[in-house]
Amino acid sequence: MSGHGAPTIDLTTLNPEEASQLKLAIVAASWHTQIMDGLVDGALRAAKEAGIAEPTLLRVPGSFELPVAAARLAPHFDAVVALGVVIRGGTPHFDYVCQAATSGLTDVSVRTGVPVGFGVLTCDTEQQGIDRAGLPGSKEDKGHEAVTAALATAVTLKQFS
C-alpha cells in the first residue's frame, strides 16, 4: 500500500465491534533497531486505533525468519502482520532474503486463509527505511499501513467464515 494511487483505509470506518474482537499477531525482525522501533510503534498504534487492546508481539532475528513465525501463529489469529527491513549490500544476499520473505509470507496467507500484512521494507539505503518507518520526519508509516491492511482484510473475510 504505497506510492501513487494507494487506497485510503480509515480504521474508524470499520465496524468497531468487529475490529476490536480480532486477534492480531505482529511478528517483527530485529535488524536495524531504529527503523524497526518505528515500524513496531506504528503497528501498535494502528492496533490501538482499531480497538485491539493487546496484540501479540513476537520478535525474531531477521526478515528471513518472518515466514516461519507467521506460519506458526496464523492458525491462532485473525490477522498477522510481518515487519522487517532489508537494506541492500554488496552481495546478492539482499535479493535472496527479500524473495524468501515475500514468497514465504504470501504462501502463509494463501495457505492458511489468514491475512498477512506485509510490512517488510526492502531498501537500497538506510535513509529509505527511515523515511518509511513512521519516525519523526518520516514520509510514510509502513507499520501502521500493514496493520491497517491486514485488519481491513480480516474484517472483510469474516463475512465468509
UniProtKB/Swiss-Prot annotation:
EC number from the UniProt entry: 2.5.1.78
Gene Ontology CC: cytosol; riboflavin synthase complex
Active-site residues from the entry: H93 (proton donor)
UniProt entry tagged with the keyword Transferase: yes
Cystine pairs: none
Sample GO molecular function, one term: 6,7-dimethyl-8-ribityllumazine synthase activity
Residues given in the record as 5-amino-6-(D-ribitylamino)uracil binding sites: W31, S63, F64, E65, V85, V86, I87, F118
Entry keyword annotation includes Transferase: yes
Pathway in which the depicted protein is active: Cofactor biosynthesis; riboflavin biosynthesis; riboflavin from 2-hydroxy-3-oxobutyl phosphate and 5-amino-6-(D-ribitylamino)uracil: step 1/2
Keywords (A to Z) from UniProt: Riboflavin biosynthesis, Transferase
Catalytic activity: (2S)-2-hydroxy-3-oxobutyl phosphate + 5-amino-6-(D-ribitylamino)uracil = 6,7-dimethyl-8-(1-D-ribityl)lumazine + phosphate + 2 H2O + H(+)
CDD domains: Lumazine_synthase-I (cd09209)
Enzyme kind, highest EC tier: transferase
Example GO BP: riboflavin biosynthetic process
Domain of life: Bacteria
Ligand binding ((2S)-2-hydroxy-3-oxobutyl phosphate): G90, T91, R132
Family from the record: Belongs to the DMRL synthase family.
Function: Catalyzes the formation of 6,7-dimethyl-8-ribityllumazine by condensation of 5-amino-6-(D-ribitylamino)uracil with 3,4-dihydroxy-2-butanone 4-phosphate. This is the penultimate step in the biosynthesis of riboflavin.
HAMAP family linked to this entry: Lumazine_synth (MF_00178)
PANTHER family: 6,7-DIMETHYL-8-RIBITYLLUMAZINE SYNTHASE, 6,7-DIMETHYL-8-RIBITYLLUMAZINE SYNTHASE DMRL SYNTHASE LUMAZINE SYNTHASE
NCBIfam families referenced in this protein's UniProt entry, alphabetically: lumazine-synth
Protein name: 6,7-dimethyl-8-ribityllumazine synthase
Species name: Paenarthrobacter aurescens (strain TC1)
